[in-house]
Amino acid sequence: MLHGLRRLLTKPEGNTLAAPPPGPVPAAPQSQRAQEANAAPGAEAPPEPQAARKRIIFDISDLIQFLRESRIPSGIQRVQLNIIHYAVTDFRDRTNPVIVYFDQAQNDWLHIPEDIFLALYQATEAHDEADEEAFLALMQGLSKHQPLAAHLARFSPRDHFFLVNLGSSWWIENYFQKIRQLRKFHDLRYVPMIHDCIPLMVPEHCPRALVEDFRHWFFGAMLQADAVLTNSQWSGKDIRHHLNAAFPDAELAIHPIALNGNMRSHLAARALTEMDTVRHILPSKAPFILCVGTLESRKNHVLLFKAWARLIEHHGIEAVPYLICLGRAGWLFDEPAEFLRANPALHDRILLISSLTDGALATLYEECLFSIFNSFYEGWGLPVTESLSFGTLSLVASNTSLTEAGGKAAVYFRDNDLEDLSEKLEMLIFDTAKRLALRDHARANAEIRDWRIVADEFIDRILATEPSAAQRQEKCLRLPLGHLIHLGKAPAATPPSERALGDLLRDGLNWHRPEDWGSWTKPGVARLCLPLPDDMAEQDFLFCLRLRGPAFATPIKINIFADGEHVFGPIERTIGRGKRLGLWFSLRLNAKQLRLDIDGGAGTSLGPNDRDVGIGVTHLMLCHAEDAEARRSFLRAFPEFGLASRIKGRAILERIDIPAP
């Protein structure tokens, strides 16, 4: 299956670009081109500029991260692979695709040539152990490719780019700063895919770090995105709910696109070759029911296990089919695991399997009596769609988006209702005629589409996206008066607007990731760009900034700009080792934006194998000069600026008057 992969890895020219090829020569100004044309009698007129093209940049960072751990894709990875495969092949003339991933070591997006992506796609379709070495070499070579910025320099400055992530990106450091940096040089529209709002809707079923990272990313995305793709009407409703709660006046296009693609067309061809694998799992011809999904608390496996215990109690173990639970170990599986340990009879009827090849999965779908899918909350329900695409009946919890995934084809049980689940299981297991009739009904009513059609809908939505992020930021974001803004990871109670604002203020790429206390700048100049309230004219304001010194005394310079014009500085100070510096700037400006350029100099290392940093920035606040309560709240928040601490040299608090321009 991967016969071309080794050839691809050993082409004489190689796929690695040691240095970027020469970029396009900048077009001369129109007057200069006219002079050159007139200078040469009989010379042809210069060619007209090429028409602008639309180009989709597919960010597959999470897909690459997944493939580094497993060559067998899960549901969301299959979705990405199928859609981008069609974008690169059948719809290439429309998408003009650029494929990238974020390389953590280089802190940059790297371009992945299309033939390399197609080789990766082929590698996930096949699982020949003989080609494993070639697959690993392919993955290891990704970091040698060209940075995205250099690759984009090949194209016309008139081109329109659409940055699309069909997976997730909230784990990438300073993702939105990188997007804003690209927008400074290109006409870029950002169109993320949000599969669900599970960390916001049921945080009790998610790791705390995931909840915080997702919350931070989500509200930033609501301001950075030009449109949002999602997989169900239910998820679209959730996204709209949180958007409106955080930014009541925000307008954002949200496009639900059903992920009801035909997985059978991709998996079934390998099903017969995997029959032996399945028969190693089960006794020959043993009936079984299939449950596909991560082993985690949100999937509510304990309800299934209780139902199986009840079936065994009522009908005897020999009459009860096996339950195969296929999925990786996830978050908080303790309760169902403990239930299994406490009920030995279940050990002979419930099998937990962490991973299988696509062919083995296809065999399980085709051979099972029916599938079952239970969950407290979903964004779509890919296992339901997968099952129906194989013509296999699915018994599904009646909640969230699962009724969209199952449509009129699935059989439903009431949410988290053991009685109803047990009744439906008994009907489907012991009434063969009824089960077969429901299966035939499912096959006649399942709304399954070819992945080419799904990809076509995605591409239509993406390419129709108009710029909207800048207008939304202008409308929804202004530095609030008298509010302390944290520039690190915001506490859970932080209002979404302030959470998003803290991320938006850090401009450019010279910032490290936010931490609980604040953010380190990188060596050199880091920028804070502050959108000011509309009523700044003819009023006196106080701008408060709190800085943190690294392990060594650090000289800094601060220059202040209003609407791009330099108005004050440099302010030169030295922050002692680990000390805190509070600067209160008194100013009167008639401007829409205040910018601070903070120069941390050559920087300081945080330790062996750690980062080089400039200075730490923790909090800021803008208030009316006469707002004594706001000033007191700043001092209450940071006791080190009290008189006793300042006398002992632990902190410095300084007021700086900036003359009106």
Each PLM stretch: what is its role?
Residues 526-539, 584-590:
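Extracellular and analogous surface-interaction loops
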